[in-house]
Amino acid sequence: LSRGLGDVYKRQDMALIVQKFGGSSVKDRDRIFNVARIVANTHNAGNDVVVVVSAQGDTTDDLITKAAEITHNPSAREMDMLLAAGEEISIALLAMALNELGCHATSLTGWQAGFRTDRAYTKARITKLETERISSELERNRVVVVAGFQGLNKLDDITTLGRGGSDTSAVAIAAALHADRCQIFTDVEGVYTADPRKVRNTRKLDEITFDEMLELASLGAQVLNNRSVELAKKYNVELEVLSSLNPVPGTVVKEVVKDVEGMLIKGVAKDTDVAVITILNVPDEPGTSFKIFGLLAQKNINVDIIL
């Protein structure tokens, strides 16, 4: 992530807080106004606020279904054009709700907010974040509502960051603006030792390290996207995982934590999105592995374990 920002915006007398809300948090009118009240209360407490929002509920899946009704082989570029629409709906509705509550807000698409990416359609990576527009809106004492998950590449084409990309968008903004806090709101109250929706008697963790969270995310824990944790670790952005439905203390994700109880195991995760590929008759000669993994990389396939 190349900042290239010049002077970073920061009002000395106000904290800057980045808040991210997932699709379930804005899935209908009641949830949208619930989020709007959380954001408005944060702003009214004397903070500058940037909000990053995902597409509503199952919108992304619904858009994928609509594409499949047209063609079974859509181009990645056109899929990004389609999928980016989900977040644009969310940011507009949330900005309307905030304005309805008397909290002045401006919605920005990913490209309006300054996200620049590479050309890997549907799985793009952020290359630069130009924050001038966000900063100018904050200077006007407005809440800035940003569409997560999306950006613009060098061809001026819309790109998306892949599943969980809104988490990455939020962390990138927090890093670029040197935010005081980066809060990730979900439908659970923090990071648990296992998924509380599937396992009984789980325990919520008050703190967890970036490395531990990254391991859980890589193994299938759906609280945070693993790319967002990688970015948070790189720029040392502390994350706070909270519930948008229950105002209780959540889990802080940071570089170092005090392990008072000496827990041997912090958490258990299950990953069902895994495929096993067996390659037979591989020649034992230099360069073979490079060719194989090069082909996988071209298709944006991550290799987790080699046996």
Model-derived features: where do they sit?
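Single conserved hydrophobic/aromatic residue that forms the stacking wall/gate
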Residues: L1-Q12
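Nucleotide/pyrophosphate-binding catalytic subdomain
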Residues: K10-V229
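Flexible, glycine/charged-enriched surface loops at secondary-structure junctions
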Residues: N47-V51, L224-R227, E238-S244, V248, ...
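Terminal amphipathic helices with adjacent charged low-complexity linkers/tails
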Residues: V53-T60, V241-V257
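A broadly conserved detector of short glycine/acidic/proline-rich loop/turn motifs that flank catalytic sites
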Residues: F149-Q150, V188, S243-L245, V257, ...
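Acidic-aromatic/histidine active-site loop/patch
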Residues: A232
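Active-site scaffold of zinc-dependent metalloenzymes
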Residues: Y235
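A conserved regulatory-domain signal marking ACT and ACT-like small-molecule sensing domains
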Residues: G250-L307
